[in-house]
């Protein structure tokens, strides 16, 4: 006998398909926001029935990373929210590394950042500080990338150590 897919199974498959589409669109929106293509990011976000509010927040915080000063706006700490905060922190790192550093520890404990995301945020903070020859760059880089997996970070760390004449490190 030919097995026909029941209504419940169809509904389940469709729901799963929509979920995949949402996550696919959400990741495209994140890439667009990272590339500063806010028009594309916004149009993708509008097509996200389940994640549109969080998607809009991601695009907003990418453009106005100061919004991170109010952590209550970024709750609950879902995966989409963690993406928004991560992107915001990387933007903030370039504008105001001190503020980004202060916020990173708090957000790192409440958000679900992947190890790579933490390294990526710390890298932005560290590199911005390193370009200003600020020795705190070393602490940030060492704390979040102790294995020095990131080559750019390793190079800047070395330059900074030489510049600051800290031979023992």
Question: What feature does the model see in each segment?
Answer:
Residues 1-169:
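Alpha-helical solenoid repeat scaffolds
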């Amino acid at each position: 006998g030919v097995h026909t897919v029941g209504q419940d199974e169809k509904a389940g498959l469709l729901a799963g398909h929509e979920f995949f589409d949402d996550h696919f669109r959400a990741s495209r929106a994140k890439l667009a926001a990272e590339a500063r293509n806010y028009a594309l990011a916004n149009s993708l976000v509008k097509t996200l029935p389940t994640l549109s509010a969080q998607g809009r927040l991601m695009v907003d915080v990418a453009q106005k990373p100061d919004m991170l000063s109010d952590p209550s706006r970024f709750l609950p700490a879902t995966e989409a929210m963690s993406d928004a905060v991560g992107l915001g922190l990387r933007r903030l790192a370039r504008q105001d590394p001190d503020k980004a550093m202060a916020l990173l520890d708090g957000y790192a404990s409440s958000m679900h950042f992947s190890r790579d995301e933490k390294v990526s945020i710390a890298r932005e903070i560290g590199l911005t500080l390193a370009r200003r020859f600020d020795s705190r760059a070393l602490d940030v880089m060492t704390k979040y990338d102790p294995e020095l997996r990131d080559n750019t970070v390793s190079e800047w760390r070395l330059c900074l150590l030489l510049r600051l004449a800290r031979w023992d490190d």
